[in-house]
Amino acid sequence: MYSKQWTRIILITSPFAIALSLLLSILYGAKHLSTDIVFTSLIHFDPGNTDHQIIWHSRIPRAAGALLIGAALAVSGALMQGITRNYLASPSIMGVSDGSAFIITLCMVLLPQSSSIEMMIYSFIGSALGAVLVFGLAAMMPNGFTPVQLAIIGTVTSMLLSSLSAAMSIYFQISQDLSFWYSARLHQMSPDFLKLAAPFFLIGIIMAISLSKKVTAVSLGDDISKSLGQKKKTIKIMAMLSVIILTGSAVALAGKIAFVGLVVPHITRFLVGSDYSRLIPCSCILGGIFLTLCDLASRFINYPFETPIEVVTSIIGVPFFLYLIKRKGGEQNG
């Protein structure tokens, strides 16, 4: 009953909360803007007005990008935690984000003239590579693995991929070009790239929501999922496909952003419970709002300079990660 009430509260208030977070993101930055200027630019855009140019070509794409990326990473984390029954699973910890960034680095060396859609496809391939490496290494452990052990494998794999990317960037002198994907500065959001990525975000989120009830069954354990007639392998493959689409799109659009997929699903689970038909939509909403507000905070930490968004999410995420390890030890979800 308590979780259903929170679900209603989140769903009912979400349009207002999203609108407020977007408005704040548009208003504040290196140059503060008034609400009058913002609404005037929305109603009657003046190409000769500098403030209108800032709003349409910088602030709106940045706010919309933060909302979409936060939603995508939160949903990805919720799916990974459900299908692995691992409370530490998230794209940044399980090597998915670093796999994407690694392949993008490789393609920048080998195929420097790649188009935006090609970079998106390479990012998907990299996300899949990262996931295969981590879960493949974990499957080789003779006595199985605990959530903490899987997180360690994921972290080591991520460090390896990140180190290889750094080595290539130094050797081939593309460090400046590569800094975008490893610093994740949302103020460099490309409006055209955002339009290209938006359908992929939509597809990934629709897939996740359509799988939500089946993921709930899988998260309850093998015996229960079998008794409910669920095809566990098919569900896991489809869920990971959704994760690859969402995470790959997020990394291609804005670079690596850590811990959103860890923190937001846990907060959402605390509020709405472990039913993924509620958890995934609510994680989507809260993830978008969370990253939009983190991006807003990144503008004031070292004002008037920008702080990389991953610094803000890590300040929140690292203590939360350590708290989960201390509180739950090696136990599995469910």
From Swiss-Prot:
A GO cellular-component term linked to this record: membrane raft
Localization terms from the record: Cell membrane; Membrane raft
Conditions for induction: Induced by Btr in iron-limited conditions.
Keyword Transport on entry: yes
InterPro entries documented for this protein: ABC_BtuC-like, ABC_transptr_permease_BtuC
UniProt topology in membrane: Multi-pass membrane protein
Keyword field: Cell membrane, Ion transport, Iron, Iron transport, Membrane, Transmembrane, Transmembrane helix, Transport
Single GO molecular function: transmembrane transporter activity
Segments crossing the lipid bilayer: 9-29, 63-83, 91-111, 119-139, 150-170, 191-211, 243-263, 281-301, 305-325
Pfam families for this protein: FecCD
Classification via SUPFAM superfamilies: ABC transporter involved in vitamin B12 uptake, BtuC (SSF81345)
One biological process term in Gene Ontology: siderophore-dependent iron import into cell
Function: Involved in the uptake of iron. Probably responsible for the translocation of the substrate across the membrane. Part of the ABC transporter complex FeuABC/YusV involved in import of the catecholate siderophores bacillibactin and enterobactin.
Subunit architecture: The complex is composed of one ATP-binding protein (YusV), two transmembrane proteins (FeuB and FeuC) and a solute-binding protein (FeuA).
Protein family according to the UniProt entry: Belongs to the binding-protein-dependent transport system permease family. FecCD subfamily.
Protein name stated in the entry: Iron-uptake system permease protein FeuB
Organism for this UniProt entry: Bacillus subtilis (strain 168)
